Structures are given as structure tokens and as C-alpha cells.
Curated annotation (Swiss-Prot):
UniProt record, GO biological process: phenylalanyl-tRNA aminoacylation
Top EC class of this enzyme: ligase
EC number(s) from the headed UniProt entry: 6.1.1.20
Subunit structure of this chain's protein: Tetramer of two alpha and two beta subunits.
Family: Belongs to the class-II aminoacyl-tRNA synthetase family. Phe-tRNA synthetase alpha subunit type 1 subfamily.
Keyword Cytoplasm attributed: yes
Cofactor notes: Binds 2 magnesium ions per tetramer.
Source organism superkingdom: Bacteria
Protein name (database record): Phenylalanine--tRNA ligase alpha subunit
CDD domains listed in its UniProt record: PheRS_alpha_core
Catalytic activity: tRNA(Phe) + L-phenylalanine + ATP = L-phenylalanyl-tRNA(Phe) + AMP + diphosphate + H(+)
Keywords: Aminoacyl-tRNA synthetase, ATP-binding, Cytoplasm, Ligase, Magnesium, Metal-binding, Nucleotide-binding, Protein biosynthesis
Protein encoded by which gene: pheS
Binding residue positions for Mg(2+): E264
């Protein structure tokens, strides 16, 4: 047996006898460290003659590979044994209580959207949706809003820059972030045969920001298209909706003449409130004051015509209100900006249980 064979046997023996990782590391440093015996042999190859290097080189490299592989195998065996020992000594007490998991809550806007869908579903309305990036035709022109209307101004509407090489105005005009959910009504009238009953909740965008306005807000609009529709149907629908939403039968509505380009006649709708300890409470047969909550009216014949329907055959009414404002009135929030701040304290206070699904039988705000 040569000296290299003896060295190999000695190192393999030390490796196999290592009882822990620290001892194995000592063997590795002794053999393969910078000053290790195997490392010294590898360095000596540079001083040998070509004949000696050809003879002893393969043997020395084989020695190094055997030692390195032995160390790796022994390390894995020691780590496995250590893990098994740890698992055997550690037990799980299944009777201990589990860590408390934080619970999320439903945002008030989501809750109100669910309440609106439940109320109007009971009245035969479907929920419709549409793109938030719209063109001028669907957002303005089809709704009888002329080019000169201030709503089309840059300071009130978020317009997109035209793509490179594209015309500033295509067939449908410039692209923009919708300023209301009315384009959903247009798309529904274009793509669906009447009669139509829909609500269109969703995000809308206007260049405005203060305690009661944000650049992005939520709106719901309703549309009915049928034969023989008149203002009495609109008034009954609004009264039924408001009383169901605020869960009070003593709510009084006041309809005031107004102007909207897309309805004729148009009306602002106020809800009566009573004062209790300085607070405004929605409801009461003898209101102490009035608060505006939504706009409404009979769909303008020009809008019906723009959607390919005959206004002499089909009539309709529409209404719209801010979902965020409805939430503020019902649940007592004071600042609209808090809806979008992401303050966990605010969300915990005003949030709703995720499984608390609104129903008319159980009370939509229960």
C-alpha cells in the first residue's frame, strides 16, 4: 500500500468517526483547507516533472474527490440524524389554541353596492357593467351633451393623449376616463332589445378633490326602457328604493325641476330629514329640512334615437347617485377622502363582516 493509499484510508476513517458537524468540519479543514494535507499534495503537482505529474496527478485528484464526497455524505447523514432527533423530542400539543388570525372586513362601498343590487333585483333590475376607459361619443355625444358643454372641458374630465400617429379624434372622439356610468346605459340600449331594466354601479372619474369629492368615486345609475313609461313610475321606483335602502317607511321625497342634457323633464330628488340632538337623521313624516341625494328624469328622445330606438314607441326614465354619498348618509362618515386612505382603523370601525350578505328579509344594512 502506498503513502497515498494510507492517507486516503486515514482520512476516510476520520470522516466516518466524526460524531457531529463540528468534528466533521475539523476533518475537512485538515484535509481540504488552505493548509490541508490534500491541498498540499495538489500544490506539489506544479513542482513535479511532466512524467511524475502524469503518474501521480490522477491519483491525487482521485484522493481529493473521495475525501470531498465522503465529507458530503457524512454531513448529510449527520444533518438527517440531527433532524430526526429534533422531531422526536418536539411534539405538537393539539389542545393548544391556534394563533389568532386577523380578520378582514368588507369596505362600506362594497357593502352599499351589494345592498343596491339586492334592492333593485327585487324590483326586476339586472346589474350591468361597462369599460371605465370610454370614448367621447358614448360618454357625451350619445347622451345629448353638446361640444360646448363645460363637462367636456379638460379641467373636469381626464382625457388620454392620442397614440403616436393616430388622429386626435377618431370616429367616436377622444378616449377618456368615464365621468359617469351613463355610457353603460348607452351600450345596453344598443346591444339589448327593450324592455330594459338595469342599474349600472361602478367607478367614475372627475378632476375634483375636497372633503366631499375625490378624483375617483363610485356611482350607480338606473335605466328603464319600456312602452308607456311615465313620471309616476319613476317616482314610485325612487320612493321604494330610498325607503328600502334607509330601512324606514316614513321617508318623504321632494322632486324639484332641474336640467340634465340626457333627460327631459329632469328632476333633482331631495330626501327629508329630522334634527335629533343637532344631527341630521334621514326620515320623518314632518321633515325639518331637505337634502339632495340624486338626479333623475325621463330619458331624452335624442338619447333614445342615438341608440337606434324609436322614441315614439319606447320611453324610459333614468336616475343616478353617488354610492359613496349614500354610504356617508346611512353609516355616518364625514369625509369622503377617508374612503380611499387605506387607514386600517377606519376600515375596522366602518367595515362589515365578509359573510354578512345583505338581504331584504334580514334588512339590507344588517
Amino acid at each position: 500500500m502506498t503513502d497515498l493509499d494510507n492517507l486516503k484510508a486515514d482520512l476516510i476513517g476520520q470522516i466516518s468517526q466524526s460524531g457531529d458537524l463540528a468534528g466533521l468540519e475539523s476533518v475537512r479543514v485538515h484535509a481540504l483547507g488552505k493548509q490541508g494535507v490534500v491541498t498540499a499534495l495538489l500544490k506539489s503537482l506544479g513542482k513535479m516533472t511532466p512524467e511524475e505529474r502524469q503518474e501521480k496527478g490522477p491519483v491525487i485528484h482521485s484522493l481529493r474527490q473521495a475525501v470531498a464526497q465522503g465529507i458530503a455524505d457524512r454531513k448529510q447523514a449527520l444533518e438527517t440524524a440531527l433532524l430526526n432527533e429534533k422531531l422526536a423530542s418536539e411534539t405538537i400539543d393539539l389542545s393548544l389554541p391556534s394563533p389568532k388570525m386577523p380578520k378582514g372586513s368588507l369596505h362600506p362601498v362594497s357593502q352599499v353596492m351589494d345592498e343596491l343590487a339586492e334592492i333593485f333585483a327585487d324590483l326586476g333590475f339586472a346589474v350591468a357593467s361597462g369599460p371605465e376607459i370610454e370614448d367621447e361619443w358614448h360618454n357625451f355625444s350619445a347622451l345629448n351633451i353638446p361640444e360646448s358643454h363645460p363637462a367636456r372641458a379638460m379641467h373636469d374630465t381626464f382625457y388620454f393623449e392620442p397614440q403616436e400617429g393616430a388622429s386626435d379624434k377618431g370616429d367616436k372622439g377622444r378616449m377618456l376616463l368615464r365621468t359617469h356610468t351613463s355610457p353603460v346605459q348607452i351600450r345596453t340600449m344598443q346591444g339589448q332589445e327593450p324592455p330594459i331594466r338595469i342599474i349600472a354601479p361602478g367607478r367614475t372619474y372627475r378632476s375634483d378633490s375636497d372633503a366631499t369629492h375625490t378624483p375617483m368615486f363610485h356611482q350607480v345609475e338606473g335605466l328603464v326602457i319600456d312602452k308607456g313609461v311615465h313620471l309616476g313610475h319613476l317616482k314610485w321606483t325612487l320612493e321604494t328604493f330610498v325607503r328600502a335602502y334607509f330601512e324606514r317607511d316614513d321617508i318623504v321625497l321632494r322632486l324639484r325641476p332641474s336640467y340634465f342634457p340626457f333627460t327631459e323633464p329632469s328632476m333633482e330628488v331631495d330626501v327629508g330629514y329630522t334634527l335629533e340632538k343637532g344631527r341630521r337623521i334621514i326620515g320623518g313624516k314632518q321633515p325639518d329640512g331637505w337634502m339632495e341625494i340624486l338626479g333623475s328624469g325621463m330619458v331624452h328622445p335624442n338619447v333614445i334615437t342615438a341608440c337606434g330606438l324609436d322614441p315614439n314607441v319606447w320611453q324610459g326614465f333614468a336616475f343616478g347617485c353617488g354610492i359613496d354619498r349614500l354610504a356617508m348618509l346611512k353609516y355616518g362618515m364625514d369625509d369622503l377622502r377617508a374612503f380611499f386612505d387605506g387607514d386600517l382603523r377606519w376600515l375596522r370601525h366602518f367595515g362589515f363582516a365578509a359573510l354578512d350578505v345583505p338581504t331584504l328579509s334580514g334588512g339590507v344594512g344588517a
